[in-house]
Structures are given as structure tokens and as C-alpha cells.
């Protein structure tokens, strides 16, 4: 990332397996607790892959501080079309360097955040499970302020004629 306050997306792809209607889910929720140094930037969506159809309406999206939840609606969970698909959950975020301390090395410094999300599904028969995504690292390297090829010139002022002279 080129700027320590840049916006970017966290995306999570997950497969929902084919299920017989007797084993449909009673609940299915993707949850991401954003790490310190990252703030929600006001956009979350869900796409079905590979078609990239927007299926955001199949989920109730809520935020509470740094926690973003995608809860599948009961209407979606009761449809055969929900199962046997791959979904991509998208969360637009922004780096917030005021929440983390950079790591300094030589003439540069680096902001780094690590994140992972979970998916928890429960079948109508009560069996439930939670899976975690791999951890992803996002970073931004910046360089310490340098003044290159600077020179100092001395100026004097003659108060009577109001002119600055080198």
C-alpha cells in the first residue's frame, strides 16, 4: 500500500456445500473483527462466484465497532439456490495509523496489520461448526522525512528601505 491511510478491501471466499433439505442451515454467519490499525470504511457486500452476482440481499450485514457480521437470512437459508455455491464477502476498510505503532528500520518505517475472519454455520439438526480463514497481512512502508540537497542562505534586511539582501 502506498499510503498509511489508504482504503482497501478484505475479501473472504468460502464454499457452502450442497445440502439435502433435511440438513439445511438454521444459521450461517461470517464475522470479521478488524484489527487495531484498520477501520471500517462503510461498504460491505457479498458476491456469488464465479458469476459475481450481487447476493448482498441474502445477508443481514451489521457492524458494532470493529466487528462486521454477515448473517444469512432465513429466506436465503431455506432455498436450494443458497447451497453448493462459492461466496465472496467484501469489506472496505481504511488503514488508521493512529491506532498502531510503526516498526522502524533504517530510513523507513512500516505499519502492519494482520486479520482473519470466521464462518459459523449450524444445521437445522443442531450440528454446528466454525472455520477460520487464513491470516492475511497488510502493510505500508514509508520513509522518514529527509531534506535532500538543501542549502541555507543568509538574508539580511535593511529596515529603512524594506529590502531583503542576500
Regions found by a protein language model. Name each.
Residues 12, 24-26, 32, 76-139:
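Serine/threonine-enriched low-complexity regions used as flexible
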Residues 7, 28, 33, 77, ...:
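Extended non-catalytic domains of envelope/secretory-pathway proteins
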Residues 25-72:
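A surface/secretory-pathway sequence property marking extracellular, secreted
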Residues 4-5, 36, 83:
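Surface-exposed loops/turns
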Residues 53, 65, 69, 85-90, ...:
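...the same signal can extend to comparable exposed beta-sheet modules
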Residues 1-22, 114-116, 125, 130-166:
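Serine/threonine-rich, low-complexity linker/repeat segments that form flexible spacers/stalks
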Residues 17-18, 35, 96:
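Sec-exported extracytoplasmic/periplasmic mature domains
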Residues 9-11, 66-77, 166:
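Generic recognition of long tandem-repeat/solenoid scaffolds
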Amino acid at each position: 500500500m502506498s499510503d498509511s491511510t489508504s482504503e482497501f478491501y478484505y475479501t473472504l471466499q468460502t464454499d457452502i456445500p450442497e445440502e439435502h433439505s433435511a440438513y439445511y442451515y438454521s444459521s450461517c454467519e461470517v464475522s470479521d473483527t478488524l484489527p487495531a490499525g484498520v477501520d471500517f470504511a462503510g461498504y460491505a457486500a457479498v458476491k456469488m462466484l464465479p458469476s459475481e452476482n450481487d447476493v448482498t440481499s441474502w445477508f443481514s450485514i451489521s457492524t458494532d465497532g470493529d466487528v462486521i457480521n454477515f448473517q444469512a437470512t432465513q429466506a436465503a437459508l431455506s432455498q436450494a439456490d443458497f447451497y453448493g455455491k462459492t461466496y465472496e464477502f467484501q469489506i472496505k476498510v481504511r488503514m488508521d495509523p493512529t491506532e498502531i505503532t510503526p516498526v522502524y528500520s533504517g530510513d523507513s518505517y512500516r505499519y502492519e496489520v494482520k486479520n482473519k475472519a470466521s464462518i459459523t454455520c449450524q444445521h437445522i439438526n443442531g450440528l454446528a461448526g466454525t472455520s477460520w480463514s487464513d491470516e492475511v497481512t497488510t502493510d505500508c512502508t514509508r520513509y522518514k522525512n529527509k531534506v535532500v540537497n538543501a542549502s541555507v542562505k543568509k538574508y539580511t534586511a535593511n529596515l529603512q528601505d524594506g529590502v531583503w539582501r542576500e
